[in-house]
Amino acid sequence: MLEKSGSDAAIISRSGTDLTRFHIRYSHSGFTLKKNENTPWSVRQLYYGCEDQKPSIFDQGLSGFLMTHDDNIPSYVSVLLLPKPETDAMAKTALDNKLSVELLGNDYSANAYAFSTIYQNCNQWVAEMLAFAWGNLSSNDDFRNKAQAWLKANAYKPTDIDAKYSYVVWVGHMIPLLHTKDHPSENIDRKIFQVSMPAAIEEFVKNRVDNVSRVEMCLKDNRIVIHRGWDSIADGCIAGPEDDVLPAS
């Protein structure tokens, strides 16, 4: 699919952590790049290494990226294919090793507030890279603040994660990769975390760029469902009447 698209890059998201209790399907996004020096179409992403206890930029082979998910849920992947001008700018930025690191935060938080530089999650890094790809921002200093200011000025809306029960906010003080101090106090009072998630990135791209194609796929019971369009495959990886269904092997 990627080779046939004629593009050199795409935004790719996958299911990983089971977030269905928050009605969230996709947890992790990155840039799949045809000219990645690792292997063609490897995914450049922010990766948190548990052993090193710090984030880094990681180029992961596409198959490895797709296989990283919670075995208790179907495996889902979503791909955005953009027109050439936006794709070219995105690919150039994503392959810029210096900029990729400049936009890497020092401290990781899975629920990082989207408009703070205290922490960062993997999707926040993707959003901030898009700001530099499309925003003509100067790359001399204060990289993350510039990116976030541009995103806010261009109507980027992070995902509202409703922590309905007080304990979810409370454990943010206890679990190493969840934090609350970067979130506005009014959000904490409302038990809302505003976080960069793949759905927020997709909605931003959809609203900003014309003629974006979206392809969603899922794997369950040794079959692959392929769906085209902005609506989602039904929960449980159930094919719709216009979806393609292929054997997984």
Where are these regions (language model features)?
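Glycine-rich catalytic cores of cysteine/serine-nucleophile enzymes that process amide/ester linkages
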Residues: 10, 14-84, 112
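Activation targets extended, charge/polar-rich intrinsically disordered C-terminal tails
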Residues: 100-249
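N-terminal, Lys/Arg-enriched amphipathic/low-complexity engagement segments
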Residues: 1-7
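Exposed alpha-helical structural elements
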Residues: 42, 61, 85-90, 98-99, ...
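A substrate-binding/cap region within the structured catalytic cores of diverse enzymes
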Residues: 69-119, 123
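A broad "ordered helical/assembly scaffold" signature
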Residues: 9-11, 47, 150-156
